[in-house]
From Swiss-Prot:
<comment type="function">
    <text>Involved in the regulation of the cytoskeletal dynamics, plays a role in actin stress fiber formation.</text>
</comment>
<protein>
    <recommendedName>
        <fullName>Protein FAM171A1</fullName>
    </recommendedName>
</protein>
<feature type="modified residue" description="Phosphoserine">
    <location>
        <position position="525"/>
    </location>
</feature>
<feature type="modified residue" description="Phosphoserine">
    <location>
        <position position="360"/>
    </location>
</feature>
<feature type="topological domain" description="Extracellular">
    <location>
        <begin position="22"/>
        <end position="303"/>
    </location>
</feature>
<feature type="modified residue" description="Phosphoserine">
    <location>
        <position position="371"/>
    </location>
</feature>
<keyword id="KW-0325">Glycoprotein</keyword>
<keyword id="KW-1003">Cell membrane</keyword>
<keyword id="KW-0472">Membrane</keyword>
<feature type="modified residue" description="Phosphoserine">
    <location>
        <position position="358"/>
    </location>
</feature>
<feature type="transmembrane region" description="Helical">
    <location>
        <begin position="304"/>
        <end position="324"/>
    </location>
</feature>
<dbReference type="GO" id="GO:0008360">
    <property type="term" value="P:regulation of cell shape"/>
</dbReference>
<feature type="compositionally biased region" description="Basic and acidic residues">
    <location>
        <begin position="870"/>
        <end position="883"/>
    </location>
</feature>
<feature type="glycosylation site" description="N-linked (GlcNAc...) asparagine">
    <location>
        <position position="194"/>
    </location>
</feature>
<comment type="similarity">
    <text>Belongs to the FAM171 family.</text>
</comment>
<keyword id="KW-0732">Signal</keyword>
<keyword id="KW-0597">Phosphoprotein</keyword>
Length: 890
């Protein structure tokens, strides 16, 4: 209870204290009456001025007023509060008003104040037709104060003419005269209701009036130009601005009106101001600046401002120029390998995606091998000398970096064919002599077609990186560029793969029926090890032909044709060169649970029976490829040696020419592609162990595929038909299984083509492989090959190439044996290759020997006969009528 009462008393005391304080602060509170004596006199004559009006102002408000008597004295009483500042003002007609501040520090008992009034000077009034001019009455050598305005701005009172007008113009020519003007305390309003008082520093002052006959002021509406000369000792400069203040008699203070401009007239400075009305004007600056008065020159200000703007713009332009120079210099000096990246078109990108995703497990196997053996890979030497003519022989193929702009591109290797007939034949002779010396060192396993092919391939492939090095040295790249070039490729022939192959080789040497490729690695050197082509296999197989350069001539059949359009290849070219792509079937193995194995084909109802039969046969993928019993198969280890000897004998006796070169019946592998792709595939397939295949298949044996088709025409995978045909039924009688898209009829009689006599011989050379596969099921090697036929057009393929009828084992094995014969013969012409191949088949089937040795003229006639059999197409070929593959033609 007591605590609440105490709190209530405290609140009451606070309110009382606030009320008392507010009462004490009210105006008049504590003020005392004071009497002030004011004496008014003439400033020029010091005579008392009677009837002068005296007013006392505080805070722009009049608190007291009075009138002087005849003696010029007036006593004024008013309430004064100590600390307040008062302004005492005296004014009279024909005098310039004057004022003075009054602020005592203590409350006085008596106070007196004297004010001198400056009489106004009469001026000369000049009324013209358009202008009214008022000029000071004192004429002299120096300029005089003057005022002029438009005549129409003058508002004359009624019954008043120009003759009734009187003008007064008074200008302060000295500091003493400036003191005769009202006290210079200015009030500067900022437009927000708040005003600031300033003590002004005067420069000059002027008073101008126009009176009528009865002494009343005459109004002037319009701009009034007031010009006042300045003192000679003024510190102002030309084009300087000085504020103009107008005296308000009702407020007793100076109000800021505008700015006046200082001009230079000869040697005299004048201040000119456009006033809205007549009255008392003063040129002054605030706040007061001690020392000489200095104003800012507007021209200098504008000049500095413009220079600042121009300087900023120049700086910005300089920065932009520096950036442009830096960019240009960077583009010019940037290393070529950093910015020359081939911009592939959208179609080519889509084609590459189709190719890379349609290549079954070969990509996974290669990537797995690369991940298992990281780091730099090389090929070591086994003590075999380099062939003398190998370097010149491979000089016909140049690895050049081409880009659309014509400049080198380290990321786009292209094959440019350039042949020299004399160098080619001399290189072949040297290679033949080298092979005669190496014949004694060939093992039994290397006598097989696969072994000879792999050995000769590695002899030729060691020169291929050297050619790339020469091309790079001609471009002038440094070692850093070569490192980037080597780093952007994956190795094609890796040392761990060869080591693994060498370890697998001795394990199977006990069996004479084993056909295995013992590849002889090329002699190694630091330069060769560093310059091995490390390009990924999938990239090599999917290179678009749009950027390949077409050769100038076609020296022999079987060469790789590089052209931008298939339309440029005429009938003669097709009869000389047969582009083909052969992929071994054992490359393309699918797991049993793969989606494509059980994928149904979208076909008409009349084909459903055939498709069901093919899918039923897919469940037995490991059946024998050839129907011949094993008892009828006899190994012939000397057939390959006989082929090589016969090939060497024919090399010196026959001369090759494009005219007498015999052509292969089916689309075979070109010579360059046979070296770079088929031998590489056969060598790498040996390294794919059963363990790796089972790991990819999820621990289950991978079934043998029927066929595999790769899209190279830029179509998406959704538009590519994946068909599977059992190759094991290809050799059976009555089997007509073939590619659904290639148009190959396996049931067509082989006698329809005279050149098919060697197919039986080739089939008889490979049964040992089948027997060995049955004995050793874990061996990863397989001899089932599937040929991918390149058909640009159905009509062109039938009429020009003449290769629509073939068997997978016929075409694939002939291509392999053809490649082996070419390697054994040292890159002999195609005519010698055909003759040698048929001579090598003679021991297997003597009855077919006369038919195998036929001339080029007979082959051309057979091709014509085959063209006439265009109508004998299989149902599969007639149903599809479209090419299996087509390059991305633009």
């Amino acid at each position: 209870m007591s605590r609440s009462a105490t709190l209530l008393l405290c609140l009451l005391g606070c309110h009382v204290w606030k009320a008392v304080t507010k009462t004490l602060r009210e105006p008049g509170a504590g003020a005392q009456e004071v009497t002030l004596k004011v004496h008014i006199s003439d400033a020029s004559t010091h005579q008392p001025v009677a009837d002068a009006l005296i007013e006392i102002f505080t805070n722009q408000a009049s608190i007291a007023s009075g009138t002087s008597g005849t003696d010029g004295v007036a006593f004024i009483k008013f309430q004064y509060k100590l600390g307040s500042q008062l302004i005492v003002t005296a004014s009279k007609h024909a005098y310039v008003p004057n004022s003075a501040p009054w602020k005592p520090i203590r409350l006085p008992v008596f106070s007196s104040l004297s004010l001198g009034l400056l009489p106004e000077r009469s001026a000369t009034l000049m009324v013209y037709e358009d202008v009214v001019q008022i000029v000071s009455g004192f004429q002299g050598a120096r300029p005089q104060p003057r005022v002029h305005f438009q005549r129409r701005a003058l508002r004359l009172p009624e019954n008043t003419s120009y003759s009734d007008l009187t003008a007064f113009l008074t200008a302060a020519s000295s500091p003493s005269e400036v003191d005769s003007f009202p006290y210079l305390r200015g009030l500067d309003g900022n437009g927000t209701g708040n005003s600031t008082r300033h003590d002004l520093t005067p420069v000059t002052a002027v008073s101008v009036h126009l009176l009528s006959s009865n002494g009343t002021p005459v109004l002037v509406d319009g701009p009034i130009y007031v010009t006042v000369p300045l003192a000679t000792q003024s510190s102002l400069r030309h084009n300087a601005y000085v504020a103009a203040w107008r005296f308000d008699q009702k407020l007793g203070t100076w109000l800021k009106s505008g700015l006046g401009l200082v001009h230079q007239e000869g040697s005299q400075l004048t201040w000119t101001y456009i006033a809205p009305q007549l009255g008392y004007w003063v040129a002054a600056m605030s706040p007061p600046i001690p020392g000489p008065v200095v104003t800012q020159d507007i021209t200098t200000y504008h000049t500095v401002f413009l220079l600042a703007i121009l300087g900023g713009m120049a700086f910005i332009l300089l920065v932009l120029l520096c950036l442009l120079l830096y960019y240009c210099r960077r583009k010019c000096l940037k290393p070529r390998q950093h910015h020359r990246k081939l911009q592939l078109p959208a179609g080519l990108e889509s084609s590459k995606r189709d190719q890379s995703t349609s290549m079954s497990h070969i990509n996974l196997l290669f990537s797995r091998r690369a991940s298992e053996f990281p780091g730099p890979l090389s090929v070591t030497s086994h003590g075999r000398p380099e062939a003398p003519g190998t370097k010149e022989l491979m000089s016909g193929v140049h690895l050049e970096m081409m880009s659309p702009g014509g400049e080198g591109d380290l990321h786009t290797p292209m094959l440019k064919l350039s042949y020299s007939t004399s160098q080619e034949f001399s290189s072949r002779e040297e290679l033949l002599s080298c092979k005669e010396e190496d014949k004694s060192q060939i093992s039994f396993d290397n006598l097989t077609p696969s072994g000879t092919l792999g050995k000769d391939y590695h002899k030729s492939v060691e020169v291929f990186p050297l050619k790339a090095r020469k091309s790079m040295e001609r471009e002038g790249y440094e070692s850093s560029g070569n490192d980037d070039y080597r780093g952007s490729y994956n190795t094609v022939l890796s040392q761990p793969l060869f080591e693994k192959q060498d370890r697998e080789g001795p394990a199977s040497t006990g069996s004479k029926l084993t056909i295995q490729e013992h590849l002889y690695p090329a002699p190694s050197s630091p330069e060769k090890e560093q310059l091995l082509d490390r390009r990924p296999t999938e990239c090599m197989m999917s290179r678009s032909v749009d950027h390949l350069e077409r050769p100038t001539s076609f020296p022999r059949p079987g060469q790789l044709i590089c052209c931008s359009s298939v339309d440029q290849v005429n009938d003669s070219v097709y009869r000389k060169v047969l582009p083909a792509l052969v992929i071994p079937a054992h490359y393309m193995k699918l797991p049993g649970d793969h989606s494509y194995v059980s994928q149904p084909l979208v076909v008409p109802a009349d084909q459903q029976l055939e498709i069901e039969r093919l899918q039923a046969e897919l469940s037995n993928p490991h059946a024998g490829i050839f129907p011949h019993p094993s008892s009828q198969i006899q190994p012939q280890p000397l057939s390959s040696q006989a082929i090589s000897q016969q090939h060497l004998q024919d090399a010196g006796t026959r001369e090759w020419s494009p005219q007498n070169a015999s052509m292969s019946e089916s689309l075979s592998i070109p010579a360059s592609l046979n070296d770079a792709a088929l031998a590489q595939m056969n060598s790498e397939v040996q390294l794919l162990t059963e363990k790796a295949l089972m790991e990819l298949g999820g621990g289950k044996p991978l079934p043998h595929p029927r066929a595999w088709f790769v899209s190279l025409d830029g179509r998406s995978n959704a538009h590519v038909r994946h068909s599977y045909i059992d190759l094991q039924r290809a050799g059976r009688n009555g089997s007509n299984d073939a590619s659904l898209d290639s148009g190959v009829d396996m049931n067509e009689p082989k006698s329809a083509r005279k050149g098919r006599g060697d197919a039986l011989s080739l089939q008889q050379n490979y049964p040992p492989v089948q027997e060995h596969q049955q004995k050793e099921p874990r061996a990863p090697d397989s001899t089932a090959y599937t040929q991918l036929v390149y058909l640009d057009d159905v009509e062109q393929s039938g009429s020009e190439c003449g290769t629509t009828v073939c068997t997978p084992e016929d075409s694939a094995l002939r291509c392999l044996l053809e490649g082996s014969s070419r390697r054994s013969g040292g890159q002999l012409p195609s005519l010698q290759e055909e003759t040698t191949r048929r001579t090598a088949d003679a021991p297997s089937e003597p009855a077919a020997s006369p038919h195998q040795r036929r001339s080029a003229h007979e082959e051309e006639e057979d091709d014509d006969d085959d063209d006439q059999g265009e109508d004998k197409k299989s149902p599969w070929q007639k149903r599809e009528e479209r090419p299996l593959m087509a390059f991305n033609i633009k």
